[in-house]
């Protein structure tokens, strides 16, 4: 009789634990992803969020100041110790590059901003550039906490310049004074990143650039397969002109997921038609002069 009582008590406690766990899980899921019957709950708009969405801390810093007018995009198809490019791979990857840049042009037009990118590319398949696109070592993607910081330094040296700043000034002169964007593309899986100037403390010699991998780490998709590559290109180029990630802090992600679920700085997708540049991101890159009204 005593054993039966203990067993019943154990079963009751087990049921209670499971029930409480489910209640907490459901409550958190409802809070984060929407209310009952599919109606989303609006996240609390704190003073901290209001202050955050009224600033654009990286706008106008570094070499990439104005995301408007005519801009030259210098694409470097970089080989390293683990990967290389051939003519076919370059041709395939030029498609998402063009699509990503077209997306930004169309979004600028939505805000009444004239923007046109001109693409120039460099690759080991081009005559005279074979040894100039070799990165000494392996390009690191940050997945293990380490990043490649000397990409532009190596490229500047390979092309015969004394510094990254001299490289930049040369390409700016060749582009008749237009803005110049530097993008290095590596033919392997990895986490793409933008080496963006975050504050005036970096000094005037800092040359912003993006390092883009052909696939997000672990996907290993052939270049002719549909992927989120175009949105990655657009996302990283927007970074270079001051657009911040909208998914770093949970409170920011919750609010932007509710307010601006399609924003390019919140996520990526293989269907660019599902993305846009929201009012806040437009403000951070200078397309509008005032921050958005928040509710």
Predicted regions and their residues:
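N-terminal Sec-pathway targeting helices
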Residues: 2-16
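Hydrophobic membrane-insertion alpha-helices, especially the h-region
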Residues: 13-25
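Hydrophobic single-pass membrane-insertion segments
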Residues: 25-37
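Propeptide-to-catalytic entry region of secreted or membrane-anchored zinc metalloproteases
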Residues: 34-177
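Auxiliary, metal-adjacent structural segments of Zn-dependent hydrolase domains
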Residues: 161-207
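Short pre-active-site segment immediately N-terminal to the catalytic Zn-binding motif
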Residues: 211-233
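Catalytic Zn2+-binding segment of zinc metalloproteases
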Residues: 237-252
């Amino acid at each position: 009789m005593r054993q039966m009582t203990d067993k019943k008590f154990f079963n009751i406690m087990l049921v209670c634990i499971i029930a409480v766990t489910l209640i907490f899980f459901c409550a958190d899921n409802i809070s984060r992803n929407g209310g009952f019957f599919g109606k989303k709950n609006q996240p609390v708009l704190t003073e901290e969020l209001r202050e955050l969405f009224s600033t654009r801390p990286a706008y106008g810093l570094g070499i990439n100041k104005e995301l408007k007018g005519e801009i030259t995009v210098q694409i470097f198809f970089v080989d390293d110790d683990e990967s290389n490019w051939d003519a076919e791979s370059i041709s395939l990857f030029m498609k998402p590059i063009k699509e990503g840049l077209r997306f930004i042009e169309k979004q600028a037009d939505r805000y009444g901003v004239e923007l046109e990118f001109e693409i120039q590319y460099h690759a080991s398949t081009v005559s005279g550039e074979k040894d100039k696109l070799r990165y000494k070592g392996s390009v690191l993607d940050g997945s293990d906490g380490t990043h490649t910081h000397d990409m532009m330094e190596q490229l500047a040296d390979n092309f015969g310049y004394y510094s990254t700043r001299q490289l930049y000034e040369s390409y700016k002169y060749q582009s008749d004074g237009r803005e110049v964007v530097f993008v290095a593309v590596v033919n392997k899986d990895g986490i793409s990143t933008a080496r963006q100037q975050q504050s005036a403390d970096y000094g005037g010699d800092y040359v912003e650039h993006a390092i883009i991998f052909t696939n997000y780490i672990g996907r290993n998709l052939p270049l002719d397969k549909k992927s989120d590559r175009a949105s990655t290109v657009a996302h990283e180029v927007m970074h270079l002109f001051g657009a911040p990630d909208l998914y770093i802090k949970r409170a920011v992600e919750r609010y932007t997921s509710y307010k601006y679920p399609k924003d390019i700085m919140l996520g990526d997708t293989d269907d660019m038609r599902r993305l846009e540049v929201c009012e806040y991101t437009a403000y951070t890159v200078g397309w509008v002069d005032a921050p958005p009204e928040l509710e």
